[in-house]
A protein has these predicted regions:
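Extended, histidine- and acidic-residue-enriched regions that form the cofactor-binding/catalytic faces
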Residues: 1-193
Length: 193
């Protein structure tokens, strides 16, 4: 959209989708862009069904548990929260009043930063769309987590050219063993099958 397209859109509607991703490892078989690719596709689908505009994706986020893997780009919690606040404030200044926040990256600190930032900007309504709450567990054979069956399946559907299933592995993780941090518990970066 050009700024003039945004001006025309705002005469009709005041809502916008703001997708978030993260640049982080997703095992040997998925790209660093997995979270953003999923968020972008979900935002596009929602836009097509509802007519809501989509803001450009925020590619970087808080990725504490995957920071040791080359290619992961991590933003500190406070820096990310302030950055999100600035973006939300800019959207408010443009006269958007309702912002739908959609993140393909679901680490708790990343989500908390987005939610806290949205509470700090007055005069906007911000809604966090948590796609992890969708009822899809009955079609999965394994518990969804990170670079797992769920994310791999979504990427195979959305961007099969970005998935290298010849590199996929089935590294077994005992979930209770890494309640504090997953940094030392997986070689491949896959948390879940």
């Amino acid at each position: 959209m050009s700024w003039n397209d945004v001006k025309s859109y705002l005469k009709q509607r005041k809502d916008i989708l703001l997708p978030f991703g993260a640049v982080e490892e997703h095992g040997y078989h998925l790209p660093l862009s997995t979270d953003g690719d999923i968020a972008s596709a979900l935002a596009q689908s929602l836009s097509e069904k509802t007519g809501v505009a989509i803001a450009p994706i925020i590619w970087y986020g808080v990725s504490n548990t995957t920071r040791r893997y080359p290619g992961t780009i991590m933003v500190r919690f406070d820096s990310f929260k302030e950055y999100v606040k600035d973006i939300l404030f800019s959207l408010k200044q443009s006269r958007f009043t309702t912002i739908y926040l959609l993140s393909g990256h679901l680490s708790s600190s990343h989500i908390v930063a987005i939610q806290e930032a949205s509470r700090d900007i007055k005069e906007i309504k911000a809604f966090f769309l948590d796609f992890s709450k969708l009822d899809f567990l009955d079609i999965l054979e394994t518990k969804p987590f990170h670079a797992c069956e769920a994310e791999t399946s979504l990427m195979l559907y959305l961007n099969p050219q970005k998935v290298d299933m010849t590199k996929a592995n089935d590294e077994k993780i005992i979930f209770e063993d890494y309640a504090v941090s997953g940094l030392r518990k997986t070689q491949s970066g896959v948390f879940g099958s």
